[in-house]
Amino acid sequence: MCFWTKPSVSWVSLFLLLSLDPSTETEKPSTQDSSSTWSPGQLTEVLRVLSADDPRPLNHSRSLIRTLLEKTGCPRRTDGRQGDCNLCFEPDALLLIAGGDFEDQLKEEVIQRVSLLLLYYIIHQEEICSSKLNMSNKEYTFYLHSLLSLRQDEDSYFLSQNETEDILAFTRQYFDTSRNQCMETKVLQKKSGILSSDGADENTLPQLAATIIALSLQGVCLGQRNLPPPDYFTEYIFSALNSTNTLHLSELDKLLNTLWTKSTCIRKDKIHQLRRKQNSLTLHDGDYSNLSVSMDPESEDGPISWDQTCFSAGQLVNIFLQNKLSPISKEDFKQMSPGIIQQLLSCSCQLPQNQQAKIAPTTLEKYGYSTVAVTLLTLGSMLGTTLILFHSCEENYRLILQLFVGLAVGTLSGDALLHLIPQILGLHMQETSEFGHFYENKGHIWKLLGLIGGIHGFFLIEKCFTLLVSPGAKKGPEDAQAAEIPIPSVNTPNRKCKTISLLAIMILVGDSLHNFADGLVIGAAFSSSSEAGVTTTIAILCHEIPHEMGDFAVLLSSGLPVKIAILMNFISALTAFIGLYIGLSVSTDPCIQNWILTVTAGMFLYLSLVEMLPEMTHVQTQRPWLMFLLQNFGLTLGWLSLFLLAIYEQNIKI
């Protein structure tokens, strides 16, 4: 492929600009032809067409620029009619800024500069024509550097491919170019003699501008057409209903029923549903609108299909209102209505049933579900206190306690690792597959499950070493008090009354603060989502049963009667409701929710891995292998429960 030389680009571009006229539209080159190499030999044919349609002398710089500005400033529209042309920029000013002369023939450098100024004019036509921006009081270098720095986050010395796409998006709208397959940006750059991967610089940008203007006036589509024309939506609606240009009353009734019930979707073909494109129109310094657009994934060589594309609000505004930045008026909304109806009919933005976006719980749901959860938590803690009454043997009590300790370690650490930490880090966010399907990435759950497997593996090694090598070894200093405190008789000596009362007060105060924190955590969890509330409640409940069993044993050993101990334990459990409603009130902000859940994850890991797991390792019993089996059963049950909740929590319906 041979590339244009600098002189041929400028002159051919200019005469192609001037040669386009309404009467010669049938002579537009096809998209394929426009992508082929151009040669200066075409100049004769261009001059012949030009002289037949424009009687004005073209050897005068001012007349050439005026003709060029009229054809660029007043492009043909889709209806094929040229309206009144009110130029917002004087040809003389354009020529002076480009460094041209009124009498001499235009030089190739002036032609390229004029093309660059026209690109700036196209991008900022609304501001220029509303007198918000005056092009006459700036020098040429200002417009050159303005285009080079179109995107503030990219290199200001080069026009990147993204910036080139932004410019081409404007030109496609402005000139309403061909809807056929477009010339790729890279091909356009090569045709303009731009070989650097960085893009055009200040020396080659004017040459690229001349090529863009020339091809656009010929009707050649440049870049990638990422949005359909406005007429597409109306055509889709009529085609979906009866494939004609008119609607009968019965078909209009069918349309209304579809929109009312949302029970069926009118699809023209079976295509993968696309995720809603979050493409907003971002304004950078200098009032440049950078178009971020998306396209239905079709074959590169095939025609573009928009039938199942989900357009964002910004894209619909871009299609119907030409990137309008002001508020949408009633007339604007009338124009956009076909697009909105088409999106509803095609169900393009509808997710699969099992992947619907989670809606934040309502105030009634948060307070209702969380109150039920704390009530169950309170009853569960009381269950822990009643278990001890049915076991007069200390050995049986210790075995039951270790079963629940293992369950608590599994649920607490499992909730922290499999649910809370991923939620804090945003790993629960939905992603989109290659074909546009929604799914929640579960890869992190398997990695975290491997982490839990490592914890369990080393626990087994240490426990087996303790059982096989030193079965009669003394207990370690980490042994928990709850596991070793014998169940005393109810008749405790009165001489220890003062010490017993102090110990009971310490236990009750600590238990009240602990339950308050549990209520706070449950409130934050249910404020986040119902699923988070369920998993957190299960973890806390499994922890509360052995915890309350231990506290109750300490209260009995301190000399309190059984009935008083149960009553005091119940009163301390009620502080969870205080923490709950405080948590619900302060965790309305998602940021506060995340911080509460962050501290909760740390607390769960500390309780399970620092406080309770060492107890399971060093506790002594007369039946060590039975305790070993019960501990592992509790651990496995806790981790398995939280793992299944992490996998299937999206399917939980409350």
Swiss-Prot record:
Keywords, in A-Z order: Glycoprotein, Ion transport, Membrane, Transmembrane, Transmembrane helix, Transport, Zinc, Zinc transport
Family annotation (InterPro entries): ZIP, ZIP4_12_EF-hand, ZIP4_N, ZIP_Transporter
Origin superkingdom: Eukaryota
Extent of motif XEXPHE-motif: 543-548
Topological category with respect to the lipid bilayer: Multi-pass membrane protein
Gene Ontology MF terms in the entry: monoatomic cation:bicarbonate symporter activity; zinc ion transmembrane transporter activity
Glycosylation sites: N59, N162
Catalysed transformations (reactions): Zn(2+)(in) = Zn(2+)(out)
Metal-binding recorded as keyword: no
Topological domain spans for side Extracellular: 1-202, 391-398, 470-501, 585-594, 648-654
GO cellular component: plasma membrane
Protein name per Swiss-Prot or TrEMBL: Zinc transporter ZIP12
Species the sequence originates in: Bos taurus
Gene coding for it: SLC39A12
